Each structure stands twice: as C-alpha cells, then as structure tokens.
C-alpha cells in the first residue's frame, strides 16, 4: 500500500499575531498624528471603536463555541477595529464606531466563518455600509487644530458621547469634497488648486479628513515598514499607485481644467492607506505575481474613476469596498489567480499524488 507523501512545510517567524502586530505598528505613527491633530473626540472615538471590535470578537467566538483565548489574542479583531476607526470622521458619535465594529466583526468576518474566510476586508465593509446608511455623520469633516487648541477633555466627552454640535463652527470640507463641490459649481481646476491646502500640509496631514488618513508621509512610511519586514510585497502598491498616477497624468494633460494632477491624487484622501494596508489584505488579494498586477491595476483604475461619478468619498479608502465601488474588484481576485497561475504549476496541482488512488 502506497501512502501519499506530505509536501514540504514552509517555516516563518511571522505568525498571525506577529503579522497583525507589525501592521498595527506600521499604522501607529499616522494614527497618533491623527489623534493629536483632532484631539479628545478622536481619541474617545478611536478607543470606543477598537474596544467594541474586540468585545464583538469575543462574543462571536463564545456563540460559535470556538476557543476564545487564541483567536481573541491574535490581534485580528484589534486591527479590524483600528482600521475602522482610522476611516471615521474624527468627531463622529461613539455609536458610529460601535456600529462599524459590529459590521466588521460580526457581519463581514464571523458571518462568513471567521478569520481567513471573509470575502471582503471587514473594515472596508464597515466603511462602505456606514457611508451608505449614515452619509451625514460620515461626511462631516473637522479642520485639525491640535490636542492643546481643540476641545477640552470634558468637551471631547460631550462631543463623542452626548452629540454636542458646538464644533460646527470649525467644520470644513475635505480636499476631495471641496474639489467636487467646486467643479459642480462650474469652476475650473486652475481656479480650484489655489484654494486648496499647500503641498506640505497635504503631505504631512494638516488638512481635514478621516481620523487616520490625512498624513500621506506617515502612511507611506508605515507601508515601507511592511515592505522591509516582508509582510507585503511591492507588486500591489506599485500597481495601484502606478495606475492612479498614469491615468491622472493622461487626463490632466488632455483636460487640465477638469482633472487634477497626479500629485493631488497621491496626497488626497487615503491613497496610501489603500495601496499599502487595504489592497494588500492577505485574505482578499491574489497570491500570484501576475494576479497581483491585474488586481492592483483594477483597484487603481477604480480609485481614479469612482470620484468622477460624484460618489461621496469615492476615493475614500481606495480599497475594494469603499462606498461599494471596489467590491467587484475584491471578488475578482480568485479569477485573477486562476488566469495567471503558471501552466506547469496548474497541471501539477491537478495531478493526483502517486499512490493516492490506491
């Protein structure tokens, strides 16, 4: 009797928990910057969102009768809650964060079987559903004034947990929202660009936006950490950013009065968060190199095209599910792998092991 021979095992220092911890570390600089710039309301919202995500994780594990300790401490729930919090307006009410965590953990993750079984990135599902269900709360932007100059501790509690509206006096439009409104009013890009924040402010993050998405530099540095530690490969980020730059450069050259230059796309919204942290999600992205290129180009194209349709925060998270616009691209990744897997590899995978049928 012939017994099938087990395949070789790949060993790595990066367990699930270590991988999640590394991603959290990469997100930390941009997150801390956002918390400092937007102050106490952002801090309270962030903590509420992350803690509620972990609580929902434990509850789902308990209901499913799964071991709580290994899954609740692997960092996946914390990371999902962290990403949800980073995509929220900094002065959003506490219940927006809790609902976002519920959607991410209960609906987008455990409803499909838990870690590794989700069809879409849980945080992006939460973001998409929140934008559709709560457009006002999800499109209210605040100009960053710093922790010391912003609302006090007690005032921050009032804003986050009691719904105080006193902050309306300092509310502002995000870069993308401002451009859309001005174009709708008939202004040209040449007239709009001088009214935007300068390049330095957009790079560093001194602009209105979501809690952890404003600093292009810090998010890019976090992405570089993921590349250096080999948590991700450069293929998908290069495909996303390269496609976005190429399309915006062509359109800006052909119609400069209507289309923004590439640098504005790279420093607006959450392009870097998308390219390095969302599009590279292990579960929802391809594994073959060619598949990653196809997948990244698809996301980069959608990131450029969706704002042209006047959808709210169309670039938003630049991920596969942002405002539901990127959902089809996430669903295509198995097809991208199937079409791009080497023929020899596919043939070997289809051939039964010697003696397996005996």
Swiss-Prot record:
Subcellular location(s) of the protein: Cellular chromatophore membrane
Membrane topology: Multi-pass membrane protein
EC assignment: 7.-.-.-
Pfam families assigned: NQR2_RnfD_RnfE
Regions that span the bilayer: 16-36, 38-58, 68-90, 128-148, 206-226, 236-256, 286-306
Induction: Expression is reduced under iron-limiting conditions.
EC supergroup of this enzyme: translocase
Described function: Part of a membrane-bound complex that couples electron transfer with translocation of ions across the membrane. Required for nitrogen fixation. Involved in electron transfer to nitrogenase.
GO terms (BP aspect): electron transport chain; nitrogen fixation; transmembrane transport
Main location group: membrane
Organism: Rhodobacter capsulatus
Taxon lineage: Bacteria, Pseudomonadati, Pseudomonadota, Alphaproteobacteria, Rhodobacterales
Required co-factors: FMN
Similarity-based family: Belongs to the NqrB/RnfD family.
Keywords: Electron transport, Flavoprotein, FMN, Membrane, Nitrogen fixation, Phosphoprotein, Translocase, Transmembrane, Transmembrane helix, Transport
Keyword Membrane found: yes
Superkingdom assignment: Bacteria
Gene: rnfD
Protein name listed in UniProt: Ion-translocating oxidoreductase complex subunit D
Recorded GO CC terms: plasma membrane; plasma membrane-derived chromatophore membrane
Alphabetized InterPro entries for the sequence: NqrB/RnfD, RnfD_bac
Assembly description: The complex is composed of six subunits: RnfA, RnfB, RnfC, RnfD, RnfE and RnfG.
């Amino acid at each position: 009797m012939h017994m099938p021979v087990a395949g070789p095992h790949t060993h790595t220092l990066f367990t699930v928990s270590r991988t999640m911890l590394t991603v959290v570390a990469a997100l930390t600089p941009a997150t801390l910057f956002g918390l400092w710039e937007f102050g106490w309301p952002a801090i309270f919202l962030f903590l509420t969102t992350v803690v509620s995500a972990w609580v929902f994780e434990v509850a789902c594990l308990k209901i499913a009768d799964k071991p709580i300790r290994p899954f609740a401490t692997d960092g996946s729930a914390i990371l999902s809650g962290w990403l949800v919090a980073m995509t929220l307006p900094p002065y959003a009410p506490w219940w927006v964060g809790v609902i976002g965590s519920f959607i991410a953990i209960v609906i987008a993750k455990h409803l499909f079987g838990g870690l590794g079984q989700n069809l879409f990135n849980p945080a992006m599902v939460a973001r998409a559903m929140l934008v559709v269900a709560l457009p006002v709360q999800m499109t209210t932007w605040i100009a960053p004034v710093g922790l010391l100059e912003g609302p006090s501790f007690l005032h921050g509690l009032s804003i986050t947990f009691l719904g105080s509206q006193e902050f309306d006096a300092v509310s502002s439009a995000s870069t993308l929202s401002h451009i859309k409104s001005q174009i709708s009013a008939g202004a040209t890009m040449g007239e709009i660009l001088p009214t935007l924040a300068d390049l330095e402010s957009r790079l560093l993050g001194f602009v209105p936006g979501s809690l952890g998405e404003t600093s292009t530099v810090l998010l890019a540095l976090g992405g570089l950490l993921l590349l250096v530690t080999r948590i991700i490969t450069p293929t998908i980020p290069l495909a996303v950013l390269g496609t976005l730059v190429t399309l915006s450069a062509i359109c800006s050259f052909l119609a400069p009065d209507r289309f923004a230059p590439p640098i504005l796309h790279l420093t607006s919204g959450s392009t870097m968060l998308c390219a390095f942290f969302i599009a590279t999600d292990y579960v929802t992205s391809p594994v073959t190199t060619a598949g990653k290129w196809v997948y990244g180009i698809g996301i980069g194209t959608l990131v450029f095209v969706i704002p042209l349709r006047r959808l709210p925060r169309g670039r938003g998270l630049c991920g596969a599910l942002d405002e539901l616009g990127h959902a089809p691209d996430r669903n295509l990744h198995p097809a991208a792998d199937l079409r791009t897997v080497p023929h020899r590899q596919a043939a070997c995978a289809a051939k039964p092991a010697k003696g397996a049928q005996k």
